[in-house]
Regions:
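Basic- and hydrophobic-enriched, low-structure N-terminal and domain-boundary segments
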Residues: 1-67, 414, 426
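P-loop NTPase motor domains
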Residues: 17-40, 109-117, 132-325, 387, ...
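P-loop NTPase motor core of the ASCE superfamily
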Residues: 143-191, 342-427
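Conserved P-loop NTPase motor cores
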Residues: 52, 59-72, 77-82, 96, ...
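Walker A/P-loop NTP-binding active-site region of P-loop NTPases
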Residues: 72-137, 175
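Short, well-ordered loop/turn elements at secondary-structure boundaries
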Residues: 29-30, 41-43, 60-61, 81, ...
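Conserved beta-strand scaffold positions in the cores of enzyme catalytic domains, especially
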Residues: 45, 101, 119-121, 255-257, ...
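Short helix/loop capping segments that flank catalytic or ligand/cofactor-binding pockets
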Residues: 46, 56-58, 75, 110, ...
Length: 427
């Protein structure tokens, strides 16, 4: 038999990795929070921090997405990542961290107690109230235009959420002018939603003239918007958003948790509360003081059901680099990112834009009916897609701007108490 001679070829692992993507992954380096072991590097340690990754040029934005079915370690990862980041980045040679957590289910209280975070519970008739129209650090006259735009975008999103439709051109324009009028009034440097409803009910001549309508005619045209905003001031949300903020945010503390669990089982109310609370936090975090801030938005999928709310969230994401804020969104299923809309709709396209502004994706196991969405939305190859459906508890597929890791997340003994979300299921 004639022997076949094949020319010898020598190549690097970088070339081989293009043939089989999981071969000899180099890892992301050691800078950041230690999270566990990277199974693609032979079990070496895995560390990550979105701000460090941004500074190294690994990503162009510090935002993160965490997705996974319940009970597979998603919540434990978020909590341990937060606790370790606050512990590590607290020395003289590091940039200090500050965290804000939107907690729809009330499950972050043990973590808050462990870290010394302030817990603020919002509930009807309670003593804590936030004003979504707060100026915060944007109260500087030089930033008035940005503040007015933010307020107008927020209120349009809130009204659209209640009305289940986008505002018509007249409503949109009149709303913006009403906010502009309030924002320019010295006695109302911090206008409230109640103030805005009052202007919509009795439009000043300056607003009515701009739309070429008599004030009483304009008031009737804005009735639906006024009723929509009043939903935030009455009934199940009474006392939560109907006046000036009663909460003092201490920038020298470690952070805060907004407990929204009282409205968790009311989907419509929770969407409004999440949106209003997110707006208040975004304004509160808009400080150029050199501190890196992490905003955690649990159950973020609830804000992706309408174009206005999705656009507002995307605008917040885009501002992250300006103020040193990393947004961490938590969802269950990757299909949530389609904004509960058919492919091709404007809302779905905006949600895809939001995903593009989130370059760090931490993916715990997804059910088989979610794998096609994962492949399509995240650009996973066949090997990664198959792996995503077979990950065990505590193990996640990481995608960092095209880089891949499979990480076994580790929980230290001292962290188990604030990671346990199954206490109500045990006798």
């Amino acid at each position: 038999m004639r022997r076949v001679r094949v020319a010898r070829h020598r190549g690097t692992t970088a070339h081989l990795a293009s043939i089989y993507p999981f071969l000899a992954e180099a890892g992301l380096g050691h800078r950041g929070v230690y999270l566990g072991t990277n199974l693609l590097t032979g079990g070496g340690g895995f560390a990550y921090d979105p701000f460090e990754a941004y500074q190294q040029g690994l990503v162009t934005n510090p935002n993160m997405l965490v997705a996974g079915e319940p009970g597979l370690g998603k919540s434990s990862f978020v909590k341990t990542f937060t606790a370790r980041a606050l512990a590590i980045f607290n020395g003289p040679d590091t940039i200090r961290r500050w965290v804000a957590i939107l907690d729809p289910k009330g499950e972050y209280t043990p973590l808050a107690e462990h870290l010394g975070l302030t817990v603020i519970r919002l509930y009807p008739g309670g003593t804590s109230r936030i004003n979504p129209l707060d100026a915060g650090p944007l109260g500087d006259p030089a930033q008035r235009e940005e503040l007015t735009r933010r307020r107008a975008d927020l209120v349009a999103a809130l009204a659209g959420q209640v009305l289940r439709r986008d505002l018509d051109p007249l409503e949109d324009a009149a709303l913006g002018w009403a906010i502009q009028t309030l924002s320019s009034t010295r006695t109302l440097a911090q206008p409230t939603l109640a103030d805005l409803v009052g202007v919509l009910r009795n439009p000043p001549p300056t607003v009515a003239t701009r739309v070429h309508l008599a004030p009483d005619v304009l008031a009737r045209r804005l009735d639906q918007v006024g009723f929509a905003l009043e939903k935030l001031l009455d009934r199940s949300l009474r006392g939560m958003f109907d006046g000036p903020t009663t909460i003092t945010v201490d920038p020298d503390a470690r952070g805060l948790v907004l407990d929204l669990s009282v409205v968790h089982h009311d989907d419509d109310a929770l969407r409004l509360v999440l949106l209003a609370a997110t707006a208040w936090l975004q304004t509160t975090l808009a400080r150029r003081d050199g501190i890196h801030r992490l905003q955690i938005l649990d159950e973020a999928w609830r804000l992706l059901g309408a174009e206005r709310t999705t656009r507002y969230l995307q605008a917040c994401w885009k501002l992250c680099r300006d103020y040193g804020v990393a947004n961490l969104a938590v969802v269950h299923r990757l299909s949530d990112l389609r904004a509960q809309a058919d492919d091709g709709t404007t809302t779905a396209k905006v949600a895809m834009g939001l995903l593009a502004d989130t370059q760090t994706r931490v993916l715990f196991r997804q059910s088989s009916d979610q794998l096609d969405d994962a492949r399509h939305l995240l650009g996973l190859n066949p090997v990664e897609t198959d792996l995503l459906g077979r990950l065990t508890r505590g193990r996640a597929l990481w995608k960092v701007a095209g880089r891949t890791a499979v990480v076994q997340h580790l929980i230290a003994p001292g962290e188990a108490a604030f990671c346990d979300t199954d206490t109500s299921m045990r006798p």
